[in-house]
Structures are given as C-alpha cells and as structure tokens.
Amino acid sequence: MPTVFGYHDVKDTEHWLASPKREEVFGPMGVTNIRTFVNPQDRTKVGVMFDVPDLRQFMGAFESPQPEMIEAMQHDGVLPETLVILVEERP
C-alpha cells in the first residue's frame, strides 16, 4: 500500500486542521493513517500524508474531481492551484 503526501496552501489553517472532510472524502476509498502537517514558518502551507490502497482511484479523484471532492476542498479552504501530490517510491 503506497504512502501518498500532498501539500498545498489553505486560507485558514486552524479550520483546515479541524475539518472532518478528509475522513469523509478519503475514508470511503479505504485511505488510512491520515496525518496532517503545517509549515511552522508559513502556517498557510500544509501537508497531508495517507496510506492509499488503490492509487488509481485516489489519483483519479483529483484528475476528474467529483462534486463532493470540490465541495470538500472549498469547505477546507484549500487553494487547488497549489496542490502537489507525491507518491512513495522505493528503489
């Protein structure tokens, strides 16, 4: 199961941290071990790490976002144009 790390900017870090939307959107995909990160020098820059059982489904959720994904990102104050996703790779 690959680990995925995404980072992006948010409008309100405390709101983003407290939001249940990550679990609501990613939980049904089987995503587990969700961890959040904040840049201590610029708290509007945040990251989230996941263990993802179906990478194709996960990446597809961002490539062709459904209304619930768009609504969750808007609710959380995510600035989608700043989103970068990294996928764990091992030699």
For each feature predicted by the language model, list its residue ranges:
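Short S/T/G/P-rich N-terminal loop/turn motif that feeds into the first structured element of a domain
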Residues: M1-P91
